[in-house]
């Protein structure tokens, strides 16, 4: 896919919130890439000096195609899009793209995996990792909270529902800990539909004030932005306000349209997100 076949637009030009005709034969042109830099400019992130590394992990639950004899195959899939790719893929377009496999014939799951990897890599502008598992072929998934401290039971008053980094602060004592909250709610950049999820913050550095962190997380409640952009905003705000020596931020959003999106951003390449799935996924 090149930019003349599928030119880059802002999110407002995407299929989100618009009636579309569903295609059931393979159509890679349905993928709609959006330049990450359009929103990174808002938080002072330069493409040539990213303050983080990481990836966007997508889980796909509604993937099907026909085998060479016309019999349907169903499968699960996982996509790992590096955070340093220049483009993200809009989620409704990815759903429409995956639906286009429904009446298309492929030799086997490996052929499907190769097609998806080729198309997503072209859309994102970098190598995207793809795994496809026919049912029963994937390791059992683990549902659990992150290893850390849930801050949701703190008794705090809250009246701010747009992102406010001034709610964040840190003390003098240096600690290593993971804090997380299930109270994350953001909204689709285009449609305003609510997106629900868990967000975790793992850091080494001055102790982050937990009440302030909870207020800050809740302050995204009326904010319209894509999942990936929200996590990058959280990472940058905590970096600026709390000055951690090491930091990782990840979110696990609930499923929509047969897909869930789980962005992960970290200060160091040796860090990994907890692979356990959020109970609402």
From Swiss-Prot:
The residues annotated as the active site are: 188, 195
Query: Does this UniProt record's set of keywords contain Zinc-finger?
Result: no
List the catalysed reactions.
7-aminomethyl-7-carbaguanine + 2 NADP(+) = 7-cyano-7-deazaguanine + 2 NADPH + 3 H(+)
Could you confirm whether the keyword Calcium appears in this record? Answer: no
One GO location term (cellular component): cytoplasm
The entry marks the following residues as binding NADPH, namely: 91-92, 256-257
Q: Which NCBIfam families match?
A: QueF (TIGR03138)
Give the family this protein belongs to, as stated in its UniProt record.
Belongs to the GTP cyclohydrolase I family. QueF type 2 subfamily.
Q: How does it assemble?
A: Homodimer.
Protein's name according to its UniProt entry:
NADPH-dependent 7-cyano-7-deazaguanine reductase
Organism encoding this protein: Azoarcus sp. (strain BH72)
What gene name is given for the protein in this entry? Answer: queF
């Amino acid at each position: 896919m090149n930019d003349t076949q599928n030119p880059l637009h802002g999110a407002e030009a995407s299929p989100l919130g618009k009636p579309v005709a569903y295609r059931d034969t393979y159509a890679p042109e349905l993928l709609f890439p959006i330049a990450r830099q359009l929103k990174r400019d808002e938080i002072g992130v330069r493409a040539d000096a990213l303050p983080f590394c990481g990836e966007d992990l997508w889980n796909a639950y509604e993937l099907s195609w026909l085998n060479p004899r016309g019999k349907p195959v169903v499968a699960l899939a996982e996509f790992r899009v590096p955070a340093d790719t220049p483009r993200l893929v809009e989620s409704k377009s990815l759903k429409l793209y995956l639906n286009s496999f429904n009446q298309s014939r492929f030799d086997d799951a490996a052929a499907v995996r190769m097609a998806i990897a080729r198309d997503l890599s072209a859309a994102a502008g970098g190598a995207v990792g793809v795994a496809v598992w026919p049912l029963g072929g994937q390791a059992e998934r683990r549902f659990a909270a992150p290893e850390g401290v849930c801050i949701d039971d703190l008794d705090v008053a809250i009246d701010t529902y747009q992102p406010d980094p001034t709610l964040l602060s840190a003390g003098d004592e240096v600690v290593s800990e993971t804090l997380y909250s299930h109270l994350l709610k953001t909204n689709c950049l285009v449609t305003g539909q609510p997106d629900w999820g868990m967000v975790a913050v793992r850091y080494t550095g001055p102790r982050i004030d937990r009440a302030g962190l909870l207020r800050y997380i809740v302050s995204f409640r009326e904010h319209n932005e894509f999942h990936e952009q929200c996590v990058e905003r959280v990472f940058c705000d905590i970096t600026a306000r709390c000055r951690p020596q090491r930091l990782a931020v990840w979110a696990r959003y609930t499923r929509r349209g047969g897909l869930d999106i789980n962005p992960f951003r970290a200060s160091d390449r040796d860090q990994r997100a907890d692979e356990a799935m959020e109970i609402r996924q």
